[in-house]
Amino acid sequence: MTQTVQPTPTPQIEPNVSPESGDLRVALAQIAPRLGDRQRNLEKHLEQIEIARREGADLIVFPELSLTGYFLRDIVPDVALHRTSPEIAQLVEAAGPMALVAGFVEEGQGHQFYNAAFYAEAGRILHVHRKVYLPTYGLFEEQRYFSAGKRFQAFNAAGFGRVGIVICEDFWHVSSATIMQAEEVDVLICVVNSPARGVSGPQIGTSETYELLARTFSQLLGALVLVVNRVGFEDGLCFFGHSLVVGPNGQLIAQAPQFDESLTFVDCDLAELRRERLITPLGRDEQLLMTIEELDRIKRRRYET
């Protein structure tokens, strides 16, 4: 596996699809969105998409809320988009045959607003994930402005199997790992807006935590894990980047720079998914029905008595 860095609602039941063998060329678009400037951010997305297509990427992933920036507060309604909006259609068209993940504020039914990310390939949107866990503690206040998503759901992607998306805080909750394992994901994509916290010498605590989570998820799921964070400043806070790819055995494959915008290309061998699952068949041995029964018992004890 190699990397190149260039500066710069009812769920449907789908048949399981095994990823094809061979390489998946991923582009990690570690950008610095401008807060509230949707047009400028759209242009930056189009620039990165053009480069990624020229470099032969199969998939490009942008950070959480990549079209808007993070600390939106009262301008959330002003920057929100419907998933059928012309701006999103423009991105999907520009990506062409390349798969695309980007973050946006989605306006849903009843004028509710969601921190969301969409996945598109071959000219159409296949999936939109709405962030389930909205941090509202410390410097975070998402529950004041966003509605929470209600599910974690995987989907079938052409050529590389089952894909799941989580957004930032979702990655910190064990329920997302449990559900994604039950969904038999092959590739887990986590889009992030994480500022640098817990700085001690050259190390950034949040960066170390995301790497630890990615390595843990990859081994539990036997999956390829992509984490894409942003860079830049908002409200005096620094977003550290350090986007990364971890293989299904928990090995760090590639990592983008800290603090700088970059477009990092990573060639991932999908055959490693099969090899790792033969060596460590955690998914095969998982007791899903027992887990469901135990959770139902806990639900009755905690919420129905």
Predicted segment positions?
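C-terminal beta-strand edge segments of enzyme domains
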Residues: T2-E14, T216-T305
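Fold-independent oxyanion-binding glycine-rich loops
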Residues: I31, L65, G103-V105, A122, ...
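Active-site catalytic loop in hydrolytic enzyme cores
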Residues: R83-P86, G108-L212, L278-L282
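N-terminal active-site segment of His-dependent metallophosphoesterases
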Residues: T2-L59, I189
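Cys-nucleophile CN-hydrolase/nitrilase-fold catalytic domain and related Cys-dependent amidase chemistry
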Residues: T2, R38, E47-V132, S194-A223
